[in-house]
Regions:
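Helix-biased detector of long, well-ordered alpha-helical tracts
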Residues: 1-177
Length: 177
């Protein structure tokens, strides 16, 4: 699957839960305090990510484009949008961010943290039911988070439908310090 094949009106999907690995990194860097159980889970997500390899072949048949989430959801979605010359609308309430991040109002970590190694893909609406069936497989979580649109903007709406302003887009390999 290519990054450059997202089509207008495709659904946008992600696998798994986002933000755990970024929490693990923040914990190891002593930037955050976490409850013991979450700390262990977060560090585990960073050090041994659970790759969704069991569904790659199935998704290849149902999807137009895909990328793994290594730089953060928004950064990696931006790679698809740029390569496909399209835009997107994302619903923040639908993004499967680690519940602790939502509870502590740290949702940006789940959107831009990186190292999740989950799959981000676009698929035609006609495949929605098939993808939902795949998501019922044991240990597979797939969530629809938005849609592809004409244009080049990426809009993230909050739970009230208002535009959400993200502080950091994600990891930049060429960022100068």
């Amino acid at each position: 699957l290519l990054r450059s094949n997202a089509k207008k009106e495709d659904d946008i999907w992600v696998t798994g839960e986002l933000g755990l690995a970024a929490l693990g990194l923040a914990k190891l860097q002593k930037k955050i305090q976490l409850p013991q159980g979450l700390s262990k889970k977060a560090i585990g997500a960073l050090e041994k990510p659970m790759l969704q390899s069991s569904i790659i072949e199935i998704m290849a048949k149902l999807s137009h484009s895909a990328i793994d989430i290594s730089d953060g959801l928004i950064a990696d979605l931006s790679h698809i949008l740029e390569a496909s010359k399209v835009g997107a609308d994302i619903s923040l309430k639908d993004v499967p961010v680690t519940p602790w991040l939502k509870k502590n109002k740290l949702i940006d970590i789940g959107l831009s943290g990186g190292d999740d190694y989950q799959l981000l893909f676009t698929a035609p609406k006609k495949n929605r039911n098939k993808i939902n069936l795949v998501s019922k497989m044991p240990s597979i979580k797939i969530t629809r988070i938005g849609s592809i649109k004409k244009g080049k903007s990426l809009n993230i709406s909050d739970h009230k439908g208002m535009l959400y302003k993200l502080k950091k887009k994600g990891y930049d390999h060429f960022e100068t310090k």
